[in-house]
Amino acid sequence: MMTAAAVSNLGHLPIVDGLGLEVRGDLGLNVFNSRALLLLQELGLESVTVSAELRHQQVRDLRKYIPCEAVVYGRLPLMVTENCPLRCSGQCSAGNGGVLTDRTGARFPVLCGHGCRPEIQNSRPLYLADKPEWKKCGLRWARLRLTTETAEEALDILQRYQGSDFPAPAGFTRGLFYRGVE
């Protein structure tokens, strides 16, 4: 039984209105300040994922009118494209996604969305398990955004976030959690 819907665009609110579901704000809302949290609370959202572009101090300082979560692990979306680069290059896998490789050899996973609107992911996952600051930001939840991981990798990541003595793996990013947006 479905109990909640995640909306990543304010245009989704009328679609889920009246369905009797809890409405949760997803990463696509790009919630960047306390006024946005207040507005989303007034619009009836139950919780919100804050922007991945916020520094940890900014997340901490938000007035949390509604419960907040942040992505603390995972490949963050870089862009959603109207035209599918996989289909255009003859690599379409019927919705199973693929990979774009840049001139440096970095591999960017492509997740296929509804209506063949692919989401291009960062080549490196965000990793904060070994950094205590995210635990002091007043978040209700921490989200592990598992997209391309195998079951074994997902279990390892979960154990890293539940434990206290796990060094960072190779090939990760801290995202904008420490440097923010310029």
Model-derived segments and their meaning:
Residues 1-39, 43-182:
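Active-site pocket-lining/capping segments in soluble small-molecule metabolic enzymes
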